[in-house]
Design a protein with these regions (language model features):
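N-terminal helical cap/lid subdomain that shapes the substrate entry/recognition surface
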Residues: 1-77
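Catalytic-core regions built around general acid/base machinery
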Residues: 78-89
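Conserved serine/cysteine hydrolase catalytic core
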Residues: 93
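Conserved phosphate-coupling serine/threonine residues in phosphotransfer and NTP-handling enzymes
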Residues: 96
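Glycine-centered short loops/turns at secondary-structure junctions
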Residues: 89-90, 168
Length: 203
């Protein structure tokens, strides 16, 4: 909303909802290999501004938004406690389709990098989830990696769960809104962060 206000656009609920829809659409296209990451950053604002019939610069908005994102983060209730618990029992790796500058900035400001043995950012690797190339690249950088003892945990069916399926590892879907999985089926799912340690201990 700060970015929209800067360009004198009222960040009312309908506008923010439409931006969210457009943003998700662009990331889906990236996952499908139809557009580039730079196009994701730009197109979400280009389409929104076109629909709002404003002359605001999509290029300037995209740059400003990325800068703000890099310094913004929030924890879900129990998130850092969960990381501490898992860190004491498992090897943790972070896999993300986010942009390099945003993800590194967020991780630094959140102070959670220490919990991960390695962090795999798609822009850095040159491949995106859910492609098998992305996961093959990640696996090649993990010492003593074994698919049978590995799982991917994520909230996106199309990038995290489909990616795990493509890569041949078990999948755990974080589904707090109790959505129904239809075409992409995870091996396990949970709806609350506090339930994850027990689930992991049973599989």
């Amino acid at each position: 909303s700060k970015t929209l206000k800067h360009f004198n656009i009222d960040p009312k609920e309908a506008v923010l909802k439409r931006y969210s829809e457009l943003n998700q659409m662009q990331w889906k296209l990236l996952e499908q290999g139809k557009i580039s990451r730079d196009q994701v950053k730009l197109r979400r604002f280009q389409i929104l501004f076109n629909e709002l019939e404003t002359n605001a610069s999509a290029e300037e908005a995209a740059l400003m938004y990325e800068t703000l994102l890099a310094y913004g983060h929030y924890f879900m209730d129990g998130a850092e406690e969960l990381l501490k618990t898992l860190y004491s029992k498992y090897r943790l790796f972070l896999v993300t389709n986010g942009t390099l500058s945003v993800q590194k900035g967020r991780l630094k400001s959140a102070g959670i990098s220490r919990y991960f043995e390695n962090i795999f950012i798609s822009e850095e690797l040159g491949y995106n989830k859910p492609s098998i190339e992305y996961f093959d690249c990640c696996f090649s950088k993990i010492p003593d990696f074994h698919k049978k003892t590995s799982v991917i945990i994520g909230d996106s069916l199309t990038s995290d769960i489909q990616g795990g399926i493509n890569a041949g590892i078990r999948t755990i879907w974080f589904n707090p809104s109790h959505d129904k999985a239809v075409d992409i089926i995870p091996d396990y799912e949970f709806d609350s962060l506090r339930k994850l340690p027990e689930l992991l201990s049973k599989i």
